[in-house]
Amino acid sequence: MSDRTKGGLGQWFWVCWGVAMAWSLYRALFNEAWILDDEIAHYMISKDVWSDPRELWHPWSRPGRNILQFIPAYFGLTVARLWTLALAGFAMWLTGREGKRLGMVGLSILPLLMGFQWWFPELSYPVLTQTPFMVVWVGGVFLAMRKKMAWAALCWGYLPLVRHEGIALSALFGLWIIFAPGGFARHLLKGKWNEALKAFPRAAWLGFCTFLPLIVMNVASGLMRGEWPFMMFFESKPTEYYGSGPIWLYLKHLATGAGIPVVLLMIFGAFQKWRHLDWSLWLWATYPAYLIMHSLIYWKGLFASGGYYHFIMPMAPFVALVALRGFNGLWEKYGVKPAAAALAVVVVTGLMMPQQQWGVSDNHIPGLPVLNASLKPIAPPMKQSRFGQGVKEASEWVIKNAGGAEVLNHHAAASFWLYETGVKKLEAWGGYTPESPELCSGTLLIWDAHYSVQDDFGFTPERLEKVGWEVVENFAYKSVRIYRKK
């Protein structure tokens, strides 16, 4: 084992780590809202595992994410968020250790280049798939570089349990193994049949370790839920709802997600001279491959992608390492002042988080007047949007006025506000339509202009009025309503 894999990262690394993590911690503790509604749905499913163990293998909520988060979810949303943030901090440490193994200098600022990426503060702590995927991915690289191959294979095989596209990374890891020096496929290409035969047992063992998490998930899901998650990989277009987009969209997402300053440093770093190119470095190529894969998937409208920027946030460790190369190159060629200025811009814009201040709004909700956001020097904690506040107020109205009536809702936040209040809540995904006879007279509906009208539910105002639902109360410019069935 190389000496570069031993020893600590130095006190200044930990000072910068503390500064970077403090910014995310501040937002985790003081944000009153959430960056994505999906976080609340994931959290609720993780919490429900304790009353219904089958939910551990819930396909939409991703079993790999659930396994990592269902225990802290028992203690509440804040604890689950703090645990997830701790995983992000661990990923930052793993990235630093990899930087040391690679012989990089200036590692003390690596946490700043990672923690002040624009997407990091708002996606590092939520109960979502991003941080679990990030830590397992960089953990797989970390273990492989230290020759802990079976453990590395388990990490790479665990990725598709957290996010479906992880199966492509599992496959790339398999190719990296068999084409490595001394690998099974490399011997075959050279016509060295005896050597290939000798290398085969190792390749087979690591292949088994890579597939093991998928095998366990499918067996458990089959036994407990009667479902076989692996079949989703054979359904490339489960819905047309999410559409498609330009092939370059994820390049834009990388710039506005990680942040233009750090991406410019990364580009500069990518074009610095690479002195020691060996086979191990190719495992890091899975990161740009991941970006290319998402670009192609959304371009072709496959696998219900939606083209969302947060899908590529797990690239943060790679972005930070290559940006550090850029910082070092800037220092070597132009001196300390330009390098320090570049780092300052990364931190200042990381505190500003323009994509969060401009991009997170409810202007897309039908019926709401458009609000023009003003850019503040330091991004304030997130408040509930007008729409989100409307959902909260509607939920509070139901808690006070429902009596014994059954309540149906489609927004995950409403489920969150109604949780353990004694309200008789119906399952949103129970297959109900406005005409369902199971929805008896007096049933209440927390209707919202974003989710309720989607094809999966079909609760449009016109359809509701036609079959005898009446509006009882309005909230947030009528973008949220209480309906009662006559």
Name the predicted role of every residue range:
Residues Q130, L159-H164, A168, G257-I260, ...:
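Hydrophobic/aromatic-rich transmembrane helices and adjacent perimembrane loops
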